[in-house]
Every structure is written in structure tokens, then in C-alpha cells.
Amino acid sequence: MILAVDIGNTTTEIGYIKDLDKIETLKFKTDHGKTIDDWLINFSFFLNFYNLDETNINKIYISSVVPQVEEKITKALEKLLNVNPLLIGTDVKVPLKINYENPSEVGADRILNAFASINILNPPLIAIDFGTAVTFDVVNKNSEYDGGLIFPGLESSVNCLFSKTAKLPKVKIEKPSNIVGKNTISSIQSGIYNGYISLVEGVISKIEDEYKCKFNIILTGGHGKIISESLNLQHVFEQYLPIKGIYFLDKY
């Protein structure tokens, strides 16, 4: 059985994969202050929550964009399961040609999303991940990673607005009932939500104009589903895209 760990800037998702139809996950806060023992407790909770036999776990893969946390998690897993985790990008290379000026700059999460996507949809395609940052990752018709775009995430935008203004409140991100807000909270919610809908549709249109072809679109990430509900273009929402990427990588 495979244990997959996706360490993001805000949350760390732990998942076990029996097959593509059997994926179970839990998310924990990516806290730089957590100790090795704190992470050991998180992983033990995960195993107990799903009633998993730790002796059945024979492979562990880690995708990480937070090196400081990655080191602690690696040691916690070695201590708990007596298995050496494999770090994607270092111990395991993703079989994807990267057309980037400096390929080492591309985060493991972005490459993993791109690799997972070409196992789900036909290229050319765009994988869009709505996390702490919103990332667009472009795979060309030859299944090569061409690069992408990076924006502040929805939550990051709300936090910035709240911290940089005197009177604007911090609001929950949700789909507004009307485009025009009737109070401060609904105005911010509409601005964030509808602004990102327009951002996604506009950027995709510009990419398709530049490449002179249509792209398949796949969405993932914490706010991917709520954006998916109003996106006015054909697309797929895949909740477990990074975790499935690890599955496909293991089977490659």
C-alpha cells in the first residue's frame, strides 16, 4: 500500500492509495513550529482514523514545497513506519520534459499536477491549482511541460486586503448570490470570487490565443471546487490530483 504526503504552504495532505477508486485523505496544518513528535502524532491519528495496518505500508512518497517541514515529516515517518520516504524531484524524477529556463525552479507540486493531468486528460491541457497560490501549469500537445502562471490564492488575497486596510473585514470565501454586493462583506466576497472566475476564463483565453489551439482544463486545490461551480467553460475538477499523480508515478 502507498502512503502519499503532499506538503503545501498552508496544509499538508496525507493520503493512502489502494487504487484510483480507493483514496482516503486527511489534511493537517503545515505549521513550521511542529516538532517531529507532533507530526508523528498526526500520522498516527491518520492511521487510526482509517483503521490502517501500518505493516501494509511499503512505500511512502513525499511531494513538498516546504523544505523545513519536509525534513521533520521524513524523520517522523521513518520513526513510525520504519520506511524511508521517497522525495519527488530528488529521489524520484517525474518523467516529464520541462521547457523551463531553469527546470529546478519549478515546484514538485506543479510538475506532479502536470504529470497527473496527462494521465487523466489528453494534452494540450492546463492544470490549475487553487491553493495558497493559484498556479496555471501548461502541458503542450507533445506532453511537455511548457511553464505557467502564478497568482496569489483566494485566501491570500483576502488576508492581504484585511491586513493592508483599516476598515475592511476578513471574510469567508463563498459564492455570492449576486454580482453586485449590497454590503461590505458581500462586496468583498463578490470581488474575490467573481474576480477569480474572470481571471481563470481570461487567462485560458489568452493561452489558447497564443498557442492557437484549444486546451483541456483540469482544476484542483482547496478552492478549486467552488470556482468549478461557476466556471463558464468545459473542465474537470479533480480533488485528489497530486495524490493521483503519486499513484501514476509509482505505476510508471
Curated annotation (Swiss-Prot):
It is found in: Cytoplasm. It is an enzyme of class 2 (transferase). Its EC number is 2.7.1.33. The keyword Iron does not apply. GO terms for biological process: coenzyme A biosynthetic process. The keyword Transmembrane helix does not apply. Substrate binds at Y100, G107, A108, D109, R110, T184. ATP binds at D6, I7, G8, N9, T10, T11, T12, E13, T132. Gene3D superfamilies: 3.30.420.40. Pfam families: Pan_kinase (PF03309). GO terms for molecular function: ATP binding; metal ion binding; pantothenate kinase activity. Pathway: Cofactor biosynthesis; coenzyme A biosynthesis; CoA from (R)-pantothenate: step 1/5. It catalyses: (R)-pantothenate + ATP = (R)-4'-phosphopantothenate + ADP + H(+). Keywords: ATP-binding, Coenzyme A biosynthesis, Cytoplasm, Kinase, Metal-binding, Nucleotide-binding, Potassium, Transferase. GO terms for cellular component: cytoplasm. K(+) binds at D129. A monovalent cation. Ammonium or potassium. Its cofactor is NH4(+); K(+). Catalyzes the phosphorylation of pantothenate (Pan), the first step in CoA biosynthesis. Homodimer. HAMAP family: Pantothen_kinase_3. Belongs to the type III pantothenate kinase family. This is Type III pantothenate kinase.
